[in-house]
Structures are given as structure tokens and as C-alpha cells.
Amino acid sequence: MNPLISAASVIAAGLAVGLASIGPGVGQGTAAGQAVEGIARQPEAEGKIRGTLLLSLAFMEALTIYGLVVALALPFANPFV
């Protein structure tokens, strides 16, 4: 395998994980902060807010997992060879 293609694949894998984690990380922090604020304002709605928060966090985390899958596919199942 060409070393240049191999090096570019490793760099692309790192960028895929890094860039795929930025958006969900910011979104999860914002969602958690808003959930805490909502629970502080309406403590009786804690269960509903927590359930909605956990579901939305799972959807956001899926984006990071997609980035990880792409990052693992680049070095091991290299489509550029």
C-alpha cells in the first residue's frame, strides 16, 4: 500500500472523529443545561424532562458513532486503494 495514502487515511480518520464529535458535544451540553434549568423551574415535570433528555442525547450520540464508524473504515477497509 502506498504510504502517502495510508498516512492520509489515518489523518482523515482523526479528522472524522474530531469533527463528528464537536456538534454533538455542544448540543449535548446545551440540552443538559436546558434540562437542568427546566427541572429547576418545574420540579414536578422531572420524569418527563429526563426521559426526553435521555432520548435526545442518544440521538445526538449516534452522530458521533457514525463518525467513529467512518474513522474505523478508512484505515482498515481503505476505499482509496
UniProtKB/Swiss-Prot annotation:
It is a multi-pass membrane protein. GO terms for cellular component: chloroplast thylakoid membrane; proton-transporting ATP synthase complex; proton-transporting two-sector ATPase complex, proton-transporting domain. Pfam families: ATP-synt_C (PF00137). PROSITE patterns: ATPASE_C (PS00605). The record marks 61 as: Reversibly protonated during proton transport. It is found in: Plastid, Chloroplast thylakoid membrane. This is ATP synthase subunit c, chloroplastic. The gene is atpH.
